[in-house]
Amino acid sequence: MSLNMTRRSFIAGSTAFGGLALVSAAGMCTGCTTASPSGCGKGKSRSLYNGVEVGCITYSYRSMRQKNAEDIVQYAVEDGLGTLELKGEVVDEYLKRGGARDMGRLPALRKMFDDAGVSIHIVKYGGIGGRNEKEDEYRMAVAKALGAKCITREVPKAAEYETIGRRCAALADKHGVYIAFHNHTQIDALTYDGPLLGYSPNLRINFDIGHYVAAITDDATRFIDPLAFIEKYHEKIYSIHLKDRTTKAHGAKNLQFGKGDTPLEKLFPFLQKKGWPFYCDIELEYAIPKGSNAVKEVARCNAFCRKAAGC
C-alpha cells in the first residue's frame, strides 16, 4: 500500500482487511491465547507470530508529517501490525475536531480501527493518577470504548509511589482496566519489590526491555538479566516495549534491532517456551536512516520480530 494513497480511499477500503486479521478487543491478548501457536500472521492478528503478538506504540510515528487517527490506521496496516498501543493525543485530536470534545465520536473511531483489523490493547495517558479526577474518568472512558484493557503511564518518582499508586489503584479497580507503569532507565530489579504495585492487583508493568538494558551496571544486587527480570515479574507484566539499546558501559545507545545489547532475538523463543501472552510493542527510537521514514523503519522492526519468532 502506498503512503500516497488518499486517506479517504484507504478508510473506505479498509474493511477488506477485517476478515483477514480482526482482533477481538475483549480480554487480555486475545489472539495470543486463542490462535494456533504455530501461526505466523494468520487467524486473530496479522502480527501474531507463533504465540507472540507484536504491535507498536504509536509514538513510533511521531516524525511523520501526518499522524492523526486515520494516518495511524494506515501506517499500522502498511507495517503489517494487527494491534497498537495508542497514544492518547491521537484520540483527543479526533474527538475535538468539532471544537469541544465529543465522546459520541468514540464508536466511529473504534470501528475505523476494527474494520482495518487493528485492535487497541493499550491507550497511553502518561498523566493518569494525577490530581485531575475529571480527566482520569475521561481517560478510563476512552480506554473502555476503544476496547483497551490497559492504560499506561510513566513510573513515578519514588516519593510519589504511595500517592500515585493509591490513585491508580482506585481508578483501575473502579473501572476494571489495568494501569501499567512504563520504565525508562530509573528502575532496577528491585523497583517492583517495593510498594508501587501493591495497592491493587490491577496495577501492572509495561516493561521497556531496552531502557532496562541501558540502565544495567555491574551491581548484581540491583540488576539481573532482562529475561530473568521478565521471569521474576511475569505475573505482573502486561506488555513489553521493544527497542535495542546498548548497556551503559557501551554508551546506552538506541540502535537498529539486532545491533545493540538487548536480547531481542532470545526474547521471542523465551516467551514462546513459557507461553506468556504479553503484547510486545515496537517503540522506534533509533535515528531514522537517510531516505527512510518511521513507517518503513517500524516495518523493518516488525520483520526482525517476525523472524525472531520463527516465522
Task: Show where each model-derived region lies.
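Active-site acidic/histidine proton-transfer and metal-coordination neighborhood
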Residues: S14-A25, R46, L106, M112-F207, ...
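Active-site mouth loops of central-metabolism enzymes
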Residues: G55-K67, V123-E133
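Acidic/histidine-rich helix-loop elements
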Residues: Y59-S63, V91-G99, A214-I216
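Short beta-strand segments at enzyme active-site cores
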Residues: L84-G88, I120-V123, I151-R153, Y279-E283
